[in-house]
Amino acid sequence: MKRRSLTALVGAVSLALSSVGIAVAGEADTTNVMMKNLKTDSSIGTIQVREHDDDGVVFTPDLSGLTPGAHGFHIHENGDCSATMKNGKKVPGGAAGGHYDPEHTGHHKEPWSESGHEGDLPALYVDENGNATKPVFAPELDLEDIHGKAIMIHAGGDNYSDQPKKLGGGGPRVACGVIAE
């Protein structure tokens, strides 16, 4: 009887310790990104960014105040959401640069493609109330590679191509946040 109790106790302690280990590991592989409206500089919520086991990254938005429908959703090369000037016009979020493309492919492709920008994410879907809460999975990314980069939300959808318009035809940048180093 004592042996059975001892075995149960050891099992319970092992389970508890392994659960603590999992929680700590999960926290180390997760970061929350505050997203700001680029016109008003006000917060629209957060996106939790976490490593999905050893394969890809999951982006879980908790956003409000967006236009309903599909939005282009990308990782941009610089961790800076400030505006820049281009051809005499203000570009909101312009300091974030272009799509994250460490292999210099120069091509906008599907998020699962290995021949396009690594910063090409699946479209972000916003419900009829202006809220985005559906997770987005990016199979070609590693969290450690995107620390210090920007997450960008564009006004329109994304056709995952450079045709008929470059960069998926997503439209102007509407919201941005920086993934902490």
Q: What is the role of each PLM region?
A:
Residues K2, T7-E181:
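N-terminal leader/targeting pre-sequences
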